[in-house]
């Protein structure tokens, strides 16, 4: 592939890690953010210490606060901003962009009030004459591992296979490999909903439960993620792939996962306010829990784990009581769909 110019919108942990992957592949990378001190740190010291204390970035990675300067003559734009501001940033891009580009996003969540997937938001806000079909970049990936060039395999999903293949080639190298998929709904819902299950898995750990319980919540969590995804039009096979069970395993079992750590703290009795303050990073599983719960209610999809976590987070239900309620649900066959 010829050298591409890519704007990475969002200098968080994942945006920074993906910027390094693109830079390693010989592309021109421009990171955009709205915190001048962070942008100055990246440009002056080539670090982003809020997320990576011991990592030095390549000096060719340049950061900007000016969106117009960031987007000038770019070939592709990668959104890696928090779910709640995706629409706002997309509107700003639409007002600034003056040529057609490849649009990608690597965030995982649902818009809190509309319950919409992020690709839908980007389609709504960025006119077709300025963009390709949206490409979702998602899968089992800790930024802390990717930034040190540990092996990572994820998915590029788009309704247009050729566009997904462009992104596959854009990112792939000896330590970072992408597979293509045309099931955008499946890949996006898997990436968003696994954060909820990770909160629950972390809570079980915080409460002192063992591996049996953790395996159960991952398996049963995958079942309800699949039910909701299929109700939205996803291919059920997607959930057995990298962006499905793969992402659920890495997020639902690891201390590197901020959603798992948030659940662990909840299980140990910390308040949500204290957890969010101490974390210093967005916990997408919290807002996604409400969106998924409300969407499941709207569609009539059975999601007992999501419902339990929703009750704990938003109504103050005792976690042990929520677990008791799940364990005392009516008996069902394992493969029962409702």
Swiss-Prot record:
| Involved pathway(s) | Membrane lipid metabolism; glycerophospholipid metabolism
The record places the active site at 194 (proton acceptor)
Task: Report the InterPro entries cross-referenced here.
Answer: 6-PGluconate_DH-like_C_sf (IPR008927), 6PGD_dom2 (IPR013328), G3P_DH_NAD-dep (IPR006168), G3P_DH_NAD-dep_C (IPR006109), G3P_DH_NAD-dep_N (IPR011128), NAD(P)-bd_dom_sf (IPR036291)
Record-linked Gene3D superfamilies: N-(1-d-carboxylethyl)-l-norvaline Dehydrogenase, domain 2 (1.10.1040.10), NAD(P)-binding Rossmann-like Domain (3.40.50.720)
The EC code for this enzyme is 1.1.1.94
Q: Tell me if Signal is a UniProt keyword of this record.
A: no
Report the principal subcellular site: cytoplasm
Molecular-function annotations in GO: glycerol-3-phosphate dehydrogenase [NAD(P)+] activity; NAD binding
Instruction: Tell me which residues bind NADPH.
Output: 13-14, 108, 143, 258, 282, 284
> In the UniProt record, does the keyword RNA-binding occur?
no
Q: Give the domain of life.
A: Bacteria
Catalysed reaction equations from the record:
sn-glycerol 3-phosphate + NAD(+) = dihydroxyacetone phosphate + NADH + H(+); sn-glycerol 3-phosphate + NADP(+) = dihydroxyacetone phosphate + NADPH + H(+)
Q: Which family does it belong to?
A: Belongs to the NAD-dependent glycerol-3-phosphate dehydrogenase family.
According to its UniProt entry, the function of this protein is described as: Catalyzes the reduction of the glycolytic intermediate dihydroxyacetone phosphate (DHAP) to sn-glycerol 3-phosphate (G3P), the key precursor for phospholipid synthesis.
Q: What is this protein called?
A: Glycerol-3-phosphate dehydrogenase [NAD(P)+]
Which lineage ranks, top first, belong to the organism behind this chain? Bacteria, Bacillati, Bacillota, Bacilli, Lactobacillales
């Amino acid at each position: 592939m010829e050298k591409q110019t890519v704007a990475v919108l969002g200098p968080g942990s994942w945006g920074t890690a993906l910027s390094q992957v693109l830079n390693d592949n010989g592309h021109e990378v421009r990171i955009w953010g709205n915190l001048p001190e962070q942008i100055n740190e990246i440009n002056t010291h080539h670090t982003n210490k809020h997320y990576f204390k011991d990592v030095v970035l390549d000096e060719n990675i340049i950061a900007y606060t000016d969106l117009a300067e960031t987007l000038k003559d770019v070939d592709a734009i990668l959104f890696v901003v928090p779910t709640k501001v995706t629409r706002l940033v997309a509107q700003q891009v639409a007002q600034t962009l003056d040529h057609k580009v490849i649009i990608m996003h690597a965030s995982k969540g649902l818009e809190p009030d509309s319950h919409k997937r992020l690709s839908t938001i980007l389609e709504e806000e960025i006119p077709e004459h300025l963009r390709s079909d949206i490409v979702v970049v998602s899968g089992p990936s800790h930024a802390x591992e990717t930034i040190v060039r540990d092996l990572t395999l994820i998915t590029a999903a788009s309704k247009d296979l050729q566009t997904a293949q462009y992104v596959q080639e854009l990112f792939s190298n000896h330590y970072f490999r992408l597979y293509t998929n045309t099931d955008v709904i499946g890949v996006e819902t898997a990436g968003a909903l696994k954060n909820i299950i990770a909160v629950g898995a972390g809570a079980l750990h915080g409460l002192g439960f063992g591996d049996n319980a953790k395996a159960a919540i991952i398996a049963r969590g995958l079942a309800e993620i699949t039910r909701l995804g299929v109700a939205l039009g996803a291919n059920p096979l997607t959930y057995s792939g990298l962006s499905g069970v793969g992402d659920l395993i890495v997020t639902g079992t690891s201390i590197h996962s901020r959603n798992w750590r948030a659940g662990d703290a909840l299980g140990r009795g910390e308040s949500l306010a204290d957890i969010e303050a101490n974390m210093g990073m967005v916990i997408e599983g919290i807002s996604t829990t409400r969106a998924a719960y409300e969407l499941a209610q709207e569609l009539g999809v059975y999601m007992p784990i999501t419902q339990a976590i929703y009750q704990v987070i938003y109504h103050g239900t005792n976690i042990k009581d929520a677990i008791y309620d799940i364990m005392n649900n009516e008996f069902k066959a394992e493969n029962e769909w409702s």
